[in-house]
């Protein structure tokens, strides 16, 4: 079974210290032993779940105690391994993280509960922000395997995720997690609507992709002429986001899906505004659609320039412009702090970085997240 851990150890070896690597390996061995003989609904050995949760956290760049806690997070709840034993073997930091996740697992969410109240309870109960990040990774992997549970249970868990966990991911700035949780939940709460939008997307994709590629080529050519190093890509449309816009705006699918979106990533803030100037020189901006979230970041530290222009063939094009660092934070949110911290061992991360200051604010005001 140790080969299960290989994708994790190969990623963290050389980044974690030998003692940190040993901590993660010991946590895996204990979890593997504690869950011996247990199976998931899919028929896979239970240990595959905590390992998958830890893999998600490795992608975020979380620290060694968090990975250890992720590997052990179901032991106290689902095996004979007690919290006291865990504390003696792994210390207070890992034990407190596991205890925090266990308490969240025991929180019940009924049909009469106010989602906002439950979200505040979840945040207030987590004395360490890392508990919330582990719980989100736990919910994400479970959501990826809902096809193995009965439809009623999957639908119930999907609604709970839309009400509590996806908004929580958004408030923590973890947009990559939020979008995947929303799409997976949508698939099981509204299967017919999900399939219909999925079908429409598949039908319209060729023509939309053609226009997207044309816009990307034009922007790349302009930026090369300006000697601006950049990465220009089309932006994926998420099915749940399309559905929500259809509901809220009362618009037809074609009105929403046909709107082409691209993202431009550059090295520094000065280049962001240079890119904006180059794009507005090529295409006319739509009045009232420019947002400067670089000068005025969102509460979760999201930063980007947003503009909508009238592109080729008179089609509206939504464009996001930001630095690679801003994109990292936009994707991973609060989890980006630990990735920054790990990277900073070699690059000299400082305690007054925006990530660290934001983390301090969240720790002080958890109940208001």
What residue ranges belong to the model's regions?
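Active-site helical microenvironments for divalent-metal-assisted chemistry
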Residues: 1-317, 322-366
